[in-house]
Amino acid sequence: MYAVFQSGGKQHRVSEGQTVRLEKLDIATGEAVEFAEVLMIANGEEVKIGVPFVDGGVIKAEVVAHGRGEKVKIVKFRRRKHYRKQQGHRQWFTDVKITGISA
């Protein structure tokens, strides 16, 4: 059984027991979270597709950790003008473990 849901403007395909990295959620580590924006649920040959969401579809998960991703460097450079500018960015994320999928 697997499902597709959206969180943080992105869509994720998950199954029970899987750990997924999402955009930062303001929920403490160890707490439970539910996602109601379920786009699709598949159980073997039975597939439910939402318009836009599956009625009664809920994905239950537990927050495992928070952190920051790898640094991305942004560089502005003008040749022959002695102009160079560097900046870095690290995006916050939340790791969640999927504990249940229900339709």
Curated annotation (Swiss-Prot):
The family line of this record is: Belongs to the bacterial ribosomal protein bL21 family.
GO molecular function terms noted in the UniProt entry: rRNA binding; structural constituent of ribosome
* Record's signal peptide: none
Q: Which HAMAP family match?
A: Ribosomal_bL21
What InterPro entries does the database record attribute to this sequence? bL21-like, bL21-like_sf, Ribosomal_bL21, Ribosomal_bL21_CS
Keyword DNA-binding in record: no
What is one GO cellular-component annotation here?
A: ribonucleoprotein complex
Question: What's a GO biological-process term for it?
Answer: translation
User: Which terms are listed as keywords in the entry?
Assistant: Ribonucleoprotein, Ribosomal protein, RNA-binding, rRNA-binding
Its domain of life reads Bacteria
Job of this protein: This protein binds to 23S rRNA in the presence of protein L20.
User: NCBIfam families given for it?
Assistant: L21
Give the record's subunit note: Part of the 50S ribosomal subunit. Contacts protein L20.
User: Does the keyword section mention rRNA-binding?
Assistant: yes
Identification of the protein by name: Large ribosomal subunit protein bL21
Record organism: Enterobacter sp. (strain 638)
